[in-house]
Swiss-Prot record:
Coiled coil: none annotated. Residues 1-23, 89-120, 193-220, 291-311 are mitochondrial intermembrane. Solcar repeats lie at residues 21-105, 118-203, 219-303. Transport of phosphate groups from the cytosol to the mitochondrial matrix. Residues 45-67, 142-171, 242-269 are mitochondrial matrix. It comes from the Eukaryota. It is found in: Mitochondrion inner membrane. Keywords: Membrane, Mitochondrion, Mitochondrion inner membrane, Repeat, Transmembrane, Transmembrane helix, Transport. This is Probable mitochondrial phosphate carrier protein. Signal peptide: none annotated. The chain crosses the membrane at residues 24-44, 68-88, 121-141, 172-192, 221-241, 270-290.
Length: 311
């Protein structure tokens, strides 16, 4: 009696870089990286936004936590959590997905040699292009988040209610009145975030000196977190004045007042020093946030069978 033949196992499908599937997974990785991390630090963001709008509202960050907890309860610490989750998940899709796309397209456009020689410029151009599009996705939820977090009495109990009230009473365009300041804040931030991360990670691999194929997955992820945290500190500093202005514009813009006129009035009221309110907490917040985002994003890429960024 003959032994039945066992059909050979189908060859394992390998994932290819720079394919629609690759960009789709990078987009999903960006959603996971940004949506989860921004949601997790909602209490820090809440205190930061309120201090930007009213510097005297809390004597310090710890006092802010205690005050909110005692007056508004644990739920109060996560005021604005839902628009944060929705908005930054959408932004993460665009930020990381488009960055990978534009980085490859721009590198291909100039050729391999020039792409390496001018790689920092490629990182800057790709990240600026990606953020320009990502902020269009973020802006409505950012406007709702700031309004909910800084209004007293409470503006709305749900994201849907806040959206309805703004659109009905002020018009849909109100949700985008902070887009230009958001670009002013986020594009330099993202350019610094991606370009500095890429170069810091490159420097870390060079400093350690091992061949890249000798690193374990844990080591690669550790390098991504370290590089992300260092890049985040730089991001916080360069983007903070615009972050303050976005908070002010979304909470303190008079009816019929243009964004430029409102920004000029607010600057006259708070001065240059006022643009730096809340910087300390933002450095801690953005450093941790950026490190965690790169950790999640590169962990997801490795899990999908792709190399970590810079590896």
């Amino acid at each position: 009696m003959s032994t039945p033949l066992i059909p050979p196992a189908p060859p394992k499908k390998t994932l290819q870089l720079y394919t629609p599937q690759y960009y789709g997974l990078c987009t999903l990785g960006g959603l996971l990286a940004c949506g989860t991390t921004h949601s997790a630090i909602t209490p820090l963001d809440l205190i930061k936004c309120r201090k930007q709008v009213n510097p005297n509202i809390y004597p310090g960050n710890i006092a802010g936590f205690k005050t909110i907890l005692s007056k508004e309860g644990l739920r109060g610490l996560y005021t604005g959590g839902m628009p944060t989750l929705i908005g930054y998940s959408l932004q993460g899709c665009g930020k990381y997905g488009f960055y990978e796309l534009f980085k490859h397209k721009y590198s291909t456009l100039v050729g391999a040699q020039k792409a390496h020689e001018y790689r920092t410029s490629i990182y800057l151009a790709a990240s600026a292009s990606a953020e320009l599009l990502a902020d269009i996705m973020l802006c409505p939820m950012e406007a709702i988040k700031v309004r909910v977090q800084t209004s007293n009495p409470r503006f709305a109990n749900t994201t849907r209610e806040a959206w309805s009230k703004i659109v009905t009473n002020e018009g849909f365009g109100t949700l985008y009145r902070g887009l230009a300041p958001l670009w002013f804040r986020q594009i330099p931030y993202t350019m610094m975030k991606f370009a500095s991360f890429e170069r810091i990670v490159e420097a870390l691999y060079t400093y350690i000196g091992k061949p890249k194929n000798m690193y374990s997955k844990a080591e690669k992820i550790g390098i991504s977190f370290a590089g992300g945290y260092m890049a985040g500190v730089l991001c916080a500093i360069i983007s903070h004045p615009a972050d303050v202005m976005v908070s002010k514009l979304n909470s303190n813009k008079k009816a019929g007042e243009g964004a430029g006129a409102a920004a000029a009035r607010i600057y006259k009221e708070i001065g240059f020093s006022g643009l730096w309110n809340g910087l300390g907490v933002r450095i801690v917040m953005i450093g941790t946030l950026t490190g965690a985002q790169w950790l999640i994003y590169d962990s997801f890429k490795i899990m999908c069978g792709f190399p970590a960024t810079g590896a």
